[in-house]
Amino acid sequence: MYQQPHTNVKTWRPVVLTAGLLFYTHPPANHIQIILKYITSMKQILTKITNGEVLTREQTCQIVRHIADGEYNDVQISALLTGLIMRGIKVDEVLGLRDGLIETGQPVDFSPYQVIDIVGTGGDNKNTFNISTCACFVVAGAGYKVAKHGNYAATSTSGASNVMEHHGVQFTADSNRLRRSMEACNFAYLHAPLFAHGMKAVAPVRKMLQIPTCFNLLGPLVNPCRPAYQLLGVANLNQMRLYSSVYEKLGIGYGIVNSIDGYDEISLTGNFKVKTNTMEKIFRPADLGLPTVRPEELYGGATPDEAAEIFDSVLENRSTESRKNVVLANAAFAIKVIERDKDIAECIAIARESLESGRALTCLKTYVELNNKNL
């Protein structure tokens, strides 16, 4: 018996792409207009991109809505992502994609708290230990509210989600449980795949392309709680310029850090640049009263278990001085983003007290205990 097919264009299998036209096997006659609507829409988008025109924030937001609703097929999404890669993505386009992912994702409300997220873009291929995740607990131990938005490792041995799972954390998207965690230990962990539904829709295409796309830039921008503050580590200065423009338009308190030798965090292996709402400066480790460290001292381990042991050693204040100092530096600049009037020496002292007093470790233990009890 004939059954009326639904109107999800993505399910109609493309058989040939030629002369700018995409043909499908036997689409229902009464759905021809739907096909033309989306092909025309994507054709207009791709024409703008190939002509060097910049899409508006609303246009790119609408693209994400269509992708999340399954209204574009994989060929169209692939063409879009490739076009943006070749032309280069612009600030308003990043903002629009970010808006769309936030809108189509699951929100988390931590108000009235003013929370901070500490995150790196990844992709620096340095395989460092979990510096930003350690810094999150140091900042939480100092009394600030931290909402860490993270995922499994992409290019390193262990990402934030790997470390959390090692400690028995069961990820949740339940706002009440996340809020109770924030209230109990100043920390909540937001496992990215549970929230960004739009990201799931492009995952197969990104996997097939096997090259970085504009969606690689969006991870740090789509924390579902929309933090008031963010410390972001980037791997190069071009990314620093792009993200700073995005943050300025979003109106949040930010700090962006880049180690000149390519780390997407403050590595203390040499000079590093910091850009905030009010300051842009190159620092030396000595400016913080800290020694320079060797790259091999930041090694993240060969296995997730080894990475978790390094993570624990830092928060238990039994790690090497180099690892400890790197975490203190990153935590201090996160505190500086929140406390603009404090100088960096004060912020380092606050971070050091949190770590050496055991308060950072207490935050971790409380968080894990609450999670394992399912709150």
Where are these regions (language model features)?
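Acidic, glycine-rich active-site loops and adjacent beta-strand->loop/helix elements
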Residues: 120-125, 150-156, 195, 260-261
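A glycine-rich phosphate/pyrophosphate-binding beta-strand-loop-alpha-helix module
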Residues: 81, 129-185
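Active-site cofactor/substrate anionic-group-binding motifs, chiefly glycine-
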Residues: 88-150
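Short, Lys/Arg-enriched N-terminal segments with co-localized hydrophobic residues
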Residues: 24-41
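Glycine-rich anion-binding loops and their surrounding alpha/beta cores
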Residues: 48, 100-106, 128, 143, ...
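Positively charged N-terminal leader segments that act as targeting/secretion signals
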Residues: 4-28
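N-terminal glycine-rich anion-binding loops that anchor highly charged ligand groups
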Residues: 41, 49-95, 102-110, 326
